[in-house]
Regions:
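Ser/Thr-glycine-rich phosphate-binding loops at phosphate-binding pockets of nucleotides
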Residues: 159-160, 164-165
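Cys-dependent protein tyrosine phosphatase-like superfamily
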Residues: 1-155, 167-267
Length: 267
């Protein structure tokens, strides 16, 4: 129980020798199991003012966020729900609850194993975000929320707090001027923060299948994998020349937006 994979992205040093402010930019997985203590911490320690939910309609209905007093809730679906077959939906599909009519569907690793069998894991799973007008517009809207002034913290979340949320963190840290290796290290921290879940689902998956290729893929899908983020950067560099080019031409941030973000979130 509790909030999975929650962390503050503050404290990182930028290439021009500033630091990302602490306690203002938070990332996490779904909040439906947040304990009273979690909620208290978010409100009293972080002075949480806004939650941006990046999930699909189905994910939200299966795990509703708690209502937090005085906290503005914003919903930005990163994945286009109208594109049923696209690899875009792979990320969301593995979190959908399977039909109750399948007896073994209650097994904790069932959804992940089925998702892998259906081809949900690909090292290129984030690259559709780079080429999707829809997803880029949603991330633009995400940055517009970041640019609104507030006195407390802003938190963004999806289901696992690693893919859509991870991409949002990568783009945010890049816009703030943090170097690529540091950004990737932060992205990979999911494997530490979710270590228990990864170990549990991996051992449960071994009860469902003996297929070694599937079992090797489970931790990459429950956690994160370096190759996925490398491919994401490769796609950005191929299509936009650089991360800076992607933030400006792909996401639509102006020079002024980036200057303002840095003024707000660096010290």
């Amino acid at each position: 129980s509790g909030v999975e994979n929650a962390r503050d992205i503050g404290g990182y040093r930028t290439m021009d020798d500033h630091h990302v402010k602490k306690r203002v930019l938070l990332r996490s997985g779904k909040l439906d199991k947040a304990t009273e203590n979690d909620k208290k911490k978010l409100l009293e320690v972080y002075h949480l003012q806004e939650v941006i939910d990046l999930r699909t309609t189905a994910e939200r209905s299966q795990a509703m966020d708690p209502v937090l007093p005085g906290v503005n809730a914003v919903w930005l679906k990163i994945l286009n729900e109208n594109v049923k077959s696209s690899s875009n939906n792979m990320i969301a599909n593995m979190f959908q609850k399977p039909a109750a009519s399948i007896p073994e569907s209650t097994h904790p690793a069932y959804g992940i194993v089925q998702a892998i069998k259906a081809g949900a894991y690909s090292p290129a799973m984030y690259t559709p975000i780079v080429s999707s007008d829809y997803s880029r517009k949603q991330y633009h809207a995400f940055f517009m929320e970041l640019l609104k002034s507030r006195d407390g913290a802003l938190l963004w979340q999806c289901t696992g707090g690693k893919d859509r949320t991870g991409v949002a963190a990568v783009l945010t840290l890049a816009a703030l001027g943090v170097d690529k290796e540091t950004i990737i290290k932060d992205y990979l921290l999911t494997n530490d923060f979710s270590a228990q879940t990864i170990a549990y689902i991996s051992s449960e998956a071994a009860k469902l299948t003996q297929d070694q290729a599937i079992l090797r893929t489970v931790p990459k899908l429950v956690g994160v994998d370096r190759e996925i983020i490398d491919r994401f950067y490769d796609a950005i560099e191929k299509q936009y020349g650089s991360m800076d080019g992607f933030l400006k031409s792909g996401i639509g941030l102006t020079k002024q937006d980036i200057t303002q973000l840095r003024a707000m979130y660096l010290e």
